[in-house]
Amino acid sequence: MANKHLSLSLFLVLLGLSASLASGQVLFQGFNWESWKHNGGWYNFLMGKVDDIAAAGITHVWLPPASQSVAEQGYMPGRLYDLDASKYGNKAQLKSLIGALHGKGVKAIADIVINHRTAEHKDGRGIYCIFEGVTPDARLDWGPHMICRDDRPYADGTGNPDTGADFGAAPDIDHLNLRVQKELAEWLNWLKADIGFDGWRFDFAKGYSADVAKIYIDRSEPSFAVAEIWTSLAYGGDGKPNLNQDQHRQELVNWVDKVGGKGPATTFDFTTKGILNVAVEGELWRLRGTDGKAPGMIGWWPAKAVTFVDNHDTGSTQHMWPFPSDRVMQGYAYILTHPGTPCIFYDHFFDWGLKEEIDRLVSVRTGA
């Protein structure tokens, strides 16, 4: 993969910037959109990468959704306790992988998909809205009354209104239902106690309110949590982001504030992602906001911002919002020498031949 290398002078400038950064967390996304296809299972394959991940100074690894899902990638889950039906591997392999990470002092982050859920059976209307928990005590055996009342055609009108954005491909779960709250919190605690996960990445977190997210974070007490709140930036007539993205980053700040700013909750800094995509194309002036600070969430609340260059949605084979491929190392030079918790993407680290360059930047950041 073609890549534009940093000049020595730019690297030295960035080295100077990094001097003010204290050692801290570095997140690693340990999969891409195609990882489920790997022969022999992704969990087993990733086991062979643990030493390299740990040696790079990475502190947390974000793993793919672990539950049974009608979509191979895991983002359409149904039987939440069933970890043996995952395309990435089985429950025993997952526990072995997490054990290997823990053995190197690296924490494991689960991809939590709770905005929506796929049903096993149809009700009397012929609608798939009867959920199977595969537990001996009927936990997660839900019906249409556990679906948001405004989520047609799945709902039967007895649930509470949705507290966030609609997800059209599957029933939106009613997170104001007390039984739903209780049983999902129990499942999260099971993922911690029995499987070994340390924290959560909340998928499609804009699908339910920050108050709802707070319930699950408070009841499961993860050491780290990060939310995906992906909304559109403000764009000008030239099709590029406006210089002022205060409204966009304020939404991220508000979410963390409502969940509890003193707790473990963070959000992916999509504001910085969008601005950086354009800035590296010869418009570095965009990296200074209207207030003279960094223009993303890291300019306002860096301790709660997780920066990234690409992920399984924006990059990989989906290419929903890809970073310029020939300037990826410029992106890493920025996020690894600026405040916030940087997230390194598997593809860039292992598949694009950028491991050594990223390693060096992480070493600069952590003082290793």
UniProtKB/Swiss-Prot annotation:
A single MF term (Gene Ontology): alpha-amylase activity
One Pfam family this sequence matches: Alpha-amylase
Statement: the UniProt record of this protein carries the keyword Membrane: no
Catalytic activity: Endohydrolysis of (1->4)-alpha-D-glucosidic linkages in polysaccharides containing three or more (1->4)-alpha-linked D-glucose units
Entry keywords, A to Z: Calcium, Carbohydrate metabolism, Germination, Glycosidase, Hydrolase, Metal-binding, Signal
Sequence positions that bind substrate: 75-76, 201-206, 230, 232, 250, 257, 293, 299-301, 312, 318
Site positions (Transition state stabilizer): 313
EC number, UniProt record: 3.2.1.1
Residues at which Ca(2+) 1 binds: 115, 162, 165, 172, 207
Residues the entry annotates as binding Ca(2+) 2: 132, 135, 137, 141
Active site: 203, 228
Cofactor binding mode and count: Binds 3 Ca(2+) ions per subunit.
Gene3D superfamilies for this protein: Glycosidases
Cofactor(s) required for function per UniProt: Ca(2+)
Superkingdom of the source species: Eukaryota
One annotated GO biological process: carbohydrate metabolic process
SMART domains the record matches: Aamy (SM00642)
Signal peptide region: 1-24
Family as reported in the entry's similarity comment: Belongs to the glycosyl hydrolase 13 family.
Record note on quaternary structure: Monomer.
Additional record remark: There are at least 4 types of alpha-amylase in barley. Type B isozyme mRNA is undetectable in unstimulated cells and increases a hundred-fold after stimulation with gibberellic acid.
Name of protein: Alpha-amylase type B isozyme
Species assigned in the record: Hordeum vulgare (Barley)
